[in-house]
């Protein structure tokens, strides 16, 4: 069984993943996979090709790519299509031979891969708590955080009957206990 963990910035995915790891389950992070892929020159060249950049660098020039996709929705879509496919394929490959695996996937609904999962757990949190959480770890301003939240999937309008939702509005230990209870319920 492969279970996705997702939620917006500052919702509490990291805390949820920590609780799941404490239970002894394998967790594969999309962000970690992306970092691994960036070490592969073929992947980096694929990123450049996806956004029509003629470049022979073997390391990703984030500014170059950002400039190429800025205000160009077609190139941004091409970039996301390429990177998301590679990330998901690597995650599912690493999941082979494991009975239960959790995938931490920040952009699950944006990428449209939710149907590939046996179960999806969505972490929800009120916006003010999300802003404070991100502020405390990033140094971003409130406006920058709100802008990022607005650019993410609108979890408030998610069909909550299709997915398991865990609300993170208590303290850390209560939330961790809630996550563990939900995981135990899902896995029977």
Residue spans of the language-model regions?
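ATP-dependent NMP and nucleoside kinases share a basic, alpha-helical "lid"
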Residues: 90-95, 100-137
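Walker A/P-loop
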Residues: 14
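Hydrophobic anchor at the beta1->P-loop junction of P-loop NTPases
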Residues: 3-5
């Amino acid at each position: 069984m492969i279970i996705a963990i997702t939620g917006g910035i500052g919702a509490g995915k990291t805390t949820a993943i920590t609780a799941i790891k404490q239970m002894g389950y394998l967790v594969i992070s999309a962000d970690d996979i992306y970092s691994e892929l960036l070490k592969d020159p073929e992947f980096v060249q694929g990123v450049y090709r996806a956004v029509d950049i003629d470049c022979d660098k073997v390391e990703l020039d984030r500014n170059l790519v950002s400039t190429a996709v800025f205000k160009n929705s077609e190139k941004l879509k091409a970039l996301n299509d390429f990177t998301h496919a590679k990330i998901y394929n690597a995650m599912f490959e690493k999941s082979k031979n494991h009975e239960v695996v959790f995938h931490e996937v920040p952009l699950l609904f944006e990428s449209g891969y939710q149907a590939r999962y046996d179960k999806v757990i969505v972490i929800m949190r009120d916006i003010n708590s999300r802003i404070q959480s991100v502020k405390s770890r990033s140094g971003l301003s409130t406006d920058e955080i709100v802008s990022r939240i607005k650019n993410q999937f609108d979890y408030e309008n998610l069909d909550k009957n299709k997915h398991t939702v865990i609300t993170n509005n208590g303290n850390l230990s209560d939330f961790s206990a809630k996550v563990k209870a939900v995981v135990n319920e899902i896995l029977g």
